[in-house]
Amino acid sequence: MAKVFILCGKICSGKSTYSQELRKSHKAVILSVDDITLTLLGQNGGDTLDVYVEKLEQYFFQKSVEIVETGINVVLDWGFWTKAERDFAKEFYGSRGIEYEFHYISINDEEWYRRLDKRNKDVLEKKSDAYYVDEGLAEKFKSIFEIPAKDEVDVWVE
């Protein structure tokens, strides 16, 4: 049976790049919240972005079951920033007998800030359609993110 690869990591940690590697090596479909929200809302999600993100995540959980049932692997490319989110995913797939793997993309703060600066520069220069992350938003994400315990994940990517 196909499986679900669940990516955990901070914004701008390399999840989307890693998801492409998994897509190629495991013949998987990527379900990315950012791809949809950026396509529909651009940089202007504002206060409604959180609502769209929550609804997309719910939709992607259901859609991933359909995809796996057809025999195709799935990569969930969003952060799973909290233990509660990770626990929900484990329960969701485990209760349905669907195989899953958690992959954590580890990044130190120095490298993270360097990548954020590069991303923001690329966004401003129209070289990237990723989200622009200002200092306030970066600190908000940093305060929310809970680094998983080693026993929470199947693959720890340095």
Range-by-range predicted roles:
Residues 4:
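Walker A (P-loop) ATP-phosphate-binding motif of ABC ATPase nucleotide-binding domains
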Residues 7:
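Hydrophobic anchor at the beta1->P-loop junction of P-loop NTPases
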Residues 10:
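P-loop (Walker A) phosphate-binding loop of NTP-binding proteins
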Residues 13, 17-72:
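Conserved substrate/cofactor phosphate-moiety recognition/catalytic segment
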Residues 28-30, 100-104, 152-157:
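Conserved beta-strand scaffold positions in the cores of enzyme catalytic domains, especially
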Residues 96-116:
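Conserved phosphate-donor/acceptor-positioning beta-strand/loop module used by diverse small-molecule
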Residues 122-158:
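Small-molecule kinase domains that catalyze NTP-dependent phosphoryl transfer to phosphate-bearing small molecules
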